[in-house]
Amino acid sequence: MDVKNKRVVVTGAASGIGKALCEAFHEADVQSIVAVDMNLDGAQETADSVDGIAVQANVG
């Protein structure tokens, strides 16, 4: 899957698979990452590590 220069939104980004996806997308040179989680502090930590932005949301 070619994601270079795409914008991505990752839910569950504070930990686990969501955090790993953010890291993988960052390595794949996406244009921007939105890290979404109910845990805003965790989402912000992930976003900071991948030059993204954090959003608090319950998508369940």
Predicted regions and their residues:
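Phosphate-coordination loops involved in phosphoryl transfer and adenosine-cofactor binding
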Residues: 4-7, 30
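Conserved glycine-rich cofactor-binding loop
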Residues: 7, 12-16, 39
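Conserved Rossmann-like nucleotide-binding pocket used by diverse enzymes
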Residues: 9, 34, 53-55
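Short glycine-rich hinge loops at helix-strand junctions in the catalytic core
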Residues: 12, 29-30, 51
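Generic hydrophobic, amphipathic alpha-helix propensity
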Residues: 17, 43-46, 50
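Residues forming the Rossmann-fold NAD(P)(H) cofactor-binding site
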Residues: 19-23
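Conserved glycine-rich Rossmann-like NAD(P)H-binding loop of the short-chain dehydrogenase/reductase
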Residues: 26-45
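Rossmann-fold cofactor-recognition segment
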Residues: 47-60
